[in-house]
Amino acid sequence: MTEQSSGSATEQATEQETAKQETGRKNEQPEERTVTDGRYLYCLINTTTAESETGSEQESKAGSEQESKAGSEQESEQATVDWSTTGVDDNTVYVIEGESVGAVVHDCERIYDTESPEQVKQWVLRHQHVVDAASDVFGTPLPMRFNTILEGGDTSVTQWLHENHDTVREELTSFAGTWEYRIHLFWEPSTFEAQIEDEDDQLQELQQRQEEAGSGKSFLLKKQYDKRLRERKQNRRAELTTTLQETVRPVVRELLKQGSGSQLAEDTTPTKKEQVTRLAVLADEENETVLGDRLDEIVEQDGVSIKFTGPWPPYTFAPDLG
């Protein structure tokens, strides 16, 4: 894996959940919202791709009868996958299976509400941890939103999987072997300013006129100079963004430009650098190295750096099935 940052993958969800809790603070005594025989959903998975919990591979067998037997043995293993992780609030995580697809869940009795942004962040990070663990066992999952809960126990989840089987299976097949990557593009404006001041004839002319003018006119010329410099910097930022998109587009399936957002402690901007843009891309696992090599070409430019994180489950691109 390339560099991973928990903050970058959960930033949007954390902000959204924190905003929801801020609204709840207006109530003097917020009531805990309970659920009846609830099942908290982390993600949906393809149970036919589960790795054996013993790590052994089944030997290939010829003939339809032997293939059927191998399939039965694999299904038996899927039901006993040993999760080496815990879920939100230290709950035990398990899989509810249904017709080649499944849901990663834990039993719950309440909605996860709190007035503490830090607690929300920890819940969301734990949610992500479970989804990541599922991806190691079952391949690319379909992540569910934080706080997605079904009432009615395992039976209700099994029924939901049955009713939505074709859609879930189709989406899992579509995302199989693909992962989400986050690309943050930074630059040092001071490096560009020093370069452009030596190359831009208009800036040089305005600078010379300032030096020769009186204080009043010099002030106006300074404003013109600053405006010209801002325009050149804005144009350069746009050029870098376009270059980044054109560089990665040939080797990714999907590309989405993301807002600046607030930076978490795990996802901070490098000192003295400004974030130009950030992208989320969906790419085949086999293209990860090629994608990284293409990004290296951009980094070769003066004052430019890139933070490349992943692979993640497709948080940005997965459909809303909750």
Curated annotation (Swiss-Prot):
It is found in: Gas vesicle. It comes from the Archaea. Residues 1-85 are annotated as: Disordered. InterPro entries: Gas_vesic_GvpL, GvpL/GvpF. GO terms for cellular component: gas vesicle. GO terms for biological process: gas vesicle organization. It holds the Pfam family GvpL_GvpF. Disulfide bonds: none annotated. Residues 45-57, 73-85 have a biased composition (Polar residues). Residues 17-36, 58-72 have a biased composition (Basic and acidic residues). Induction: Transcribed from early-log phase, decreases as cells enter stationary phase, probably as a long gvpF-gvpM RNA. Highly expressed in 25% salt, poorly expressed in 15% salt, no gas vesicles are formed at 15% salt. Its main location: other. Keywords: Gas vesicle. Proteins GvpF to GvpM might be involved in nucleating gas vesicle formation. A minor component of the gas vesicle. Gas vesicles are small, hollow, gas filled protein structures that are found in several microbial planktonic microorganisms. They allow positioning of halobacteria at the optimal depth for growth in the poorly aerated, shallow brine pools of their habitat. Expression of a 9.5 kb mc-vac DNA fragment containing 2 divergently transcribed regions (gvpD-gvpE-gvpF-gvpG-gvpH-gvpI-gvpJ-gvpK-gvpL-gvpM and gvpA-gvpC-gvpN-gvpO) allows H.volcanii to produce gas vesicles. Belongs to the gas vesicle GvpF/GvpL family. GvpF to GvpM interact with each other in vitro, and may form multi-subunit complex(es). Interacts with GvpC, GvpN and GvpO. Encoded in a 14-gene locus called mc-vac. NCBIfam families: gas_vesic_GvpL (NF045778). This is Gas vesicle protein L. It comes from Haloferax mediterranei (strain ATCC 33500 / DSM 1411 / JCM 8866 / NBRC 14739 / NCIMB 2177 / R-4) (Halobacterium mediterranei). The lineage of its organism: Archaea, Methanobacteriati, Methanobacteriota, Stenosarchaea group, Halobacteria.
